[in-house]
């Protein structure tokens, strides 16, 4: 599908570039300035400027351009071109809780090295661990706290032990259940750490900060649901000792402390 627009004569893709700011003229966006190869390049538009930097880089670029909360821009040393308090606000993110369990059988991806995975991928006709997206199964669940008939929890099953996003390699074999609350009430924000476009934006997620504490209650529900899943008969032949949390009989209070 990408060839339908990427090979168009109307499209120019510039790589190795960092957009520094949106160019404004009489309150209207007329283009962007970007850095490439140590030089600043001006790209002007005939119609519109579309920002597609996502939930973090789009508000960052707007604020670097002088569009955003006045006090924050002035504090960062950026001239206010258009005061807009909502820029960078209302950040919503899905906090994920992982439940890890040891496997009594060597059927997971924990012992698969990157090199071996690459060989297996080609030697097995593009099958095997190298063809996996790791999240082998997913589900949407409606918890007992759901206000309507829509699912409010999303789950993914991973046939490997993912501790700290996989950065911490645990010994042995195991599997992981990821669960998140789909409609969090906590709100965060994106801020500038510097007026330098090369500096990463500050992300204040403010997880579990809603005044009612509902997000935390839902994370407890996520953890309990994952344990309930691993207790099903389908896991009887594989179920080893629990890893995170270390016990399967934690009370709600203990789960709150774990979270």
Map each language-model feature to its residues.
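Conserved redox-cofactor binding core of oxidoreductases
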Residues: 1-29, 33-37, 98-118, 246, ...
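Core beta-strand elements of the Rossmann-like FAD/NAD(P) dinucleotide-binding domain
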Residues: 38-53
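Short, mixed charged/polar active-site loops
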Residues: 40-42, 147-152, 187, 200
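Short glycine-/small-residue-rich Rossmann-like dinucleotide-binding loops
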Residues: 18, 54-55
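Alpha-helical support elements that line or immediately flank enzyme active sites
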Residues: 48-49, 55-69
């Amino acid at each position: 599908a990408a060839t339908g627009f990427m090979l168009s004569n109307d499209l120019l893709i510039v790589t190795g570039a960092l957009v520094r700011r949106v160019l404004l003229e009489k309150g209207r966006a007329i283009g962007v300035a970007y850095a490439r190869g140590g030089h600043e390049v001006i790209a002007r538009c005939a119609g519109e400027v579309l920002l597609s930097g996502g939930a973090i880089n789009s508000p960052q670029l707007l604020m670097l351009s002088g569009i955003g909360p006045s006090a924050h821009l002035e504090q960062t040393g950026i001239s206010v071109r258009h005061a807009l308090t909502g820029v960078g606000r209302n950040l919503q993110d899905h906090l994920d809780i992982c439940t890890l369990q040891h496997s009594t059988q060597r059927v997971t991806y924990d012992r698969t090295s990157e090199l071996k995975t690459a060989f297996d991928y080609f030697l097995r006709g593009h099958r095997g661990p190298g063809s996996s997206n790791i999240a082998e199964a997913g589900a949407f669940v409606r918890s007992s706290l759901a206000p309507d008939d829509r699912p409010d929890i999303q789950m993914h099953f991973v046939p490997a032990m993912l501790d700290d996003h996989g950065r911490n390699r645990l010994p042995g074999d195991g599997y992981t259940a990821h669960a998140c609350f789909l409609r969090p009430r906590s709100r965060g924000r994106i801020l500038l750490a510097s007026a330098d476009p090369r500096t990463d934006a500050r992300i204040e997620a403010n997880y579990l900060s809603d005044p009612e504490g509902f997000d935390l209650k839902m994370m407890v529900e996520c953890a309990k649901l994952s344990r309930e899943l691993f207790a099903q008969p389908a896991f009887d032949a594989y179920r080893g000792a629990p890893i995170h949390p270390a016990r399967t009989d934690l009370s709600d209070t203990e789960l709150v402390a774990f979270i």
